[in-house]
């Protein structure tokens, strides 16, 4: 069965860009709320599953304020290199401040760009990651195809994203939580409507199983899923196998 996920996010791309410019100062707090305060633990599990090697050349898509990018740079070490790509300059400015604060300017390069149309040649990277970004792009399938294109043979993709719990009781609690989520905007001094959008894309994103099927459809092999917080989040790891 073909899993089509074009127009994942039907909000016009310019509107999404403007929204992230507005929420940038509160983005880290927002991610903490979305992950129920466990995003740091999620990242640790993510890298444990991804098994990055020292010296890898890595690309972090939708890098936002740079937390995953910085963690990735520490994994590849000084012999490796990381590019963090995001479509929003305000987010990149915040990422740059963090990177300079940790003296990682040599290891990390930031780039403003479109995850659906990557400005890189085929088979460029050992690792491509995307954290909390796939649900916000207009066409997630196109992003997965681009990831596959720029990965080297035997390269790995790692996706850290919110998901949908399958247990009915947990699912009900998850949905109830996100109905309250926009109210947190007031505590952060942010726009309530922006947080309604963020809660909607989080609550309505596809299941971990469907995302696995999409990855396999686009050519990735040995795709594994690790569920987080009883299914509220998920890690997907896949490999671009060498042609035999």
From Swiss-Prot:
Top EC category: transferase
Catalytic activity as recorded in UniProt: a 2-demethylmenaquinol + S-adenosyl-L-methionine = a menaquinol + S-adenosyl-L-homocysteine + H(+)
Keyword S-adenosyl-L-methionine belongs to the record: yes
Keywords of the record: Menaquinone biosynthesis, Methyltransferase, S-adenosyl-L-methionine, Transferase
BP-aspect Gene Ontology terms: menaquinone biosynthetic process; methylation
Pathway: Quinol/quinone metabolism; menaquinone biosynthesis; menaquinol from 1,4-dihydroxy-2-naphthoate: step 2/2
EC number: 2.1.1.163
UniProt GO MF annotations: demethylmenaquinone methyltransferase activity
Function, in words: Methyltransferase required for the conversion of demethylmenaquinol (DMKH2) to menaquinol (MKH2).
Family (UniProt): Belongs to the class I-like SAM-binding methyltransferase superfamily. MenG/UbiE family.
Protein's recorded name: Demethylmenaquinone methyltransferase
Name of encoding gene: menG
